[in-house]
Regions:
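Secretory/organelle targeting and membrane-embedding segments
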Residues: 1-168, 172-514
């Protein structure tokens, strides 16, 4: 057995439990996700001393490479994607734990070959036969890979003597029926507790902070209901277009790509009831309850409560940008939406008559993900002689990206001899207060998988509940193809119909300049 080395210690340990000894197997290891997100996140965990000393990584892809070529390829990228100075000693320790297997995912021989390799590496690195498999592949391979892993005995936990887990990237199905079918396929060969359906948004500090903000502060939870909240807005806006993902995106669209996963998770954390504890299933039970309480839209409501759009050419950051139909690998007559806005309702006591407005899109005016809690207006009877009709209601904004933080807008007297009100902000920024930039989210999620904490991962029932909300919209949109695409210029806030969706209710989106 090889001597176990400890990662070089160059800084104080980050608080938290070190990961269990294990081997991580990345299917799709030659892809962008591995070099841009996974390897930098694992390096950051090593630097923070949150990786076990007994650790190794095996990359699997059809690209032909040796171990050394794989290490060099990742070494060339790490300085660009790690986001900070790379410590050469830590990186050297890390690269000695990188291995590579060249194979096609549908080659049955791969899995017996992989089992032999893992058994050897387990002895070399003392990883206690703990393995987890990250499926950074096309969705069509998800079920087949897990079936083959199970058939090879690689998902067998030997009665709890060791653990075996699998992380699955989105998209998890392309509609409700395919999501159910994939869940059934997976659960026919592994247990639910072994499946970690990942959504990297849930690894972000502000998303995790939603529960702490709500339930650890006595001043907010008592007013977190229909008596005090007028409505909720959720915006996930991107300034970029589809870039090199045209062929994938054109088969998915903004609705499938963002709503049943990212946005439904944000809705659940914002609106769920207090869990009995922070144990994984206690939290996820409450999330599942609220997702099942989101009312699916009728066919008539789809026509009045949803908006779809597609970006045309425009100006982004002072530069002319092409329209969606001019992007690489996109058909010139594509009817795929790049923008979605919806008005949803939650059918329970806490949120009765409180609309949830959501929007997401590409080539919008600003890069931002945020949750806006807009409170009901105060009675301005005391200020009847003061111009208050243009004063914004109180807003609590949870900024998720790019700058993570929380802000509260409220009214205050403007200095001067007369009573005049103005809107002011109280701002909390993670980077300013804690002196560090929050991580990408993958660090937290990978670490959670290695310690067996599934709180921030979706269960089968949560995935299916998200698709239940989206499916009626997909059906109506398929029956009634759009006739006015493209209908918003790149660099704008989307089609005018999205503004009208809220204006009909006497409300407005929270828009701002970049």
């Amino acid at each position: 057995m090889a001597q176990v080395e400890t990662p070089p210690q160059t800084q104080q340990r980050t608080p938290g439990r070190p990961a269990d000894p294990c081997i991580m197997v990345i299917f799709g290891a030659a892809g962008d996700l591995t070099r841009r997100k996974l390897i930098p996140a694992l390096y950051n965990l090593a630097k923070a001393q949150l990786l076990s000393r007994e650790f190794a990584i095996v990359g699997v892809s059809h690209n032909k490479m040796s171990d050394d070529e794989f290490r060099k390829k990742l070494g060339d990228d790490i300085h660009h994607y790690a986001g900070n100075d790379v410590d050469p000693d830590i990186w050297e320790w890390f690269t000695r734990r990188l291995y590579y297997v060249t194979a096609e995912f549908d080659d049955k021989n791969l899995y017996s070959q992989l089992k032999t390799k893992l058994e050897k590496l387990d002895k070399d690195h003392s990883t206690h036969q703990n393995y987890f498999f990250y499926l950074a592949t096309a969705p069509r391979f998800f079920g087949q890979i897990v079936e083959e892993l199970s058939a090879a005995g690689l998902m067998d936990e030997a009665g709890g003597q060791h653990w075996r887990r699998v992380i699955i990237e989105k998209p998890f199905g392309h509609d409700l029926e395919s999501a159910k079918a994939l869940n059934q396929q997976l659960l026919s060969c592994v247990s639910e507790h072994q499946i970690y359906r990942i959504d990297h948004y849930l690894g972000k500090e502000t998303v995790q902070n939603i529960l702490a903000f709500r339930f650890a502060n006595g001043i907010f939870e008592p007013i977190w209901n229909r008596r005090y909240i007028d409505h909720v807005q959720i915006t996930v806006a991107e300034t970029v277009g589809v870039e090199s993902r045209g062929s994938y995106y054109d088969t998915a669209g903004a609705l499938r790509d963002m709503v049943p996963n990212h946005i439904m998770q944000l809705i659940s954390l914002t609106s769920m009831e207090p869990p009995i504890s922070f144990r994984p299933d206690a939290v996820r039970d409450e999330q599942a309850k609220i997702l099942h309480a989101v009312q699916p839209l009728s066919s008539e409501e789809v026509l009045t409560r949803t908006v779809r759009g597609q970006y045309g050419s425009g100006v982004e950051g002072g530069q002319r940008v092409p329209g969606y139909r001019q992007e690489e690998d996109v058909p010139p007559d594509s009817r795929t939406e790049t923008f979605v806005a919806m008005k949803l309702a939650i059918d329970n006591w806490r949120w009765a008559d409180v609309p949830f407005y959501l929007r997401t899109g590409k080539r919008l005016a600003a890069q931002t993900t945020e949750i806006v809690i807009q409170f009901r207006r105060a009675p301005f009877v005391l200020f009847r002689d003061t111009p208050v009709e243009n004063l914004m209601p109180n807003q609590l904004v949870l900024h998720i990206q790019p700058q993570e933080g929380i802000s509260l807008q409220f009214a205050a007297k403007v200095p001067g001899p007369i009573m005049r009100l103005g809107a002011v902000d109280m701002n909390f920024n993670y980077a300013d207060y804690f002196g560090t930039q929050p991580s990408t989210g993958y660090e937290r999620l990978l670490h959670d998988c290695m310690i067996g904490d599934a709180t921030l991962f979706q269960r089968a029932d949560m995935v299916e509940a998200g698709w239940c909300v989206v499916s009626p919209v997909l059906d109506v949109w398929k029956a009634l193809p759009p006739r006015n695409f493209p209908n918003y210029p790149g660099g704008s806030w989307g089609p005018k119909e999205a503004d009208e969706l809220m204006e009909r209710d006497g409300r407005h989106w929270r828009n701002f300049d970049r």
